[in-house]
Amino acid sequence: MTEWYKKGDLDFSKIHTVNLDEYKGIDAENKQSYHYFMNQHLFSRVNIELQNTFVPDGMNENQDEECQRYEKLIAGLGGVDLQLLGLGHNGHIGFNEPAEVFVKQTHCVSLSEKTIQANQRFFE
């Protein structure tokens, strides 16, 4: 996307981003946080207004409060029109492991052992 932006094929000036996930207990300035990753690899390289970029607050000790805040934020933006995401090694989305029932609202999950092992390389 940054290459498209550099070529003038993509404009970020009027969009809002709502990140899918963040690690709990890691602040936005930590190099392992998704917030930091997005700043380094996208937000700082395109013409997006930083006040239009949203990532869950991994440092909010009250996870229920943070989930409610994020749901209100999404609703206030009119919902999510397009979601760009990756799939985990076992098909998980946003650390939600494959299951028969999928929780739609913002929530916190515990990582499976396989997911922890797969992501361990980012914390070495």
Predicted regions and their residues:
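Glycine-rich N-terminal segment of FAD-binding domains in flavoprotein oxidoreductases
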Residues: 1-7
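Active-site cofactor/substrate anionic-group-binding motifs, chiefly glycine-
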Residues: 7-14
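Short internal beta-strands
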Residues: 14-21
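Conserved phosphate- and dinucleotide-binding cores of soluble alpha/beta proteins
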Residues: 26-124
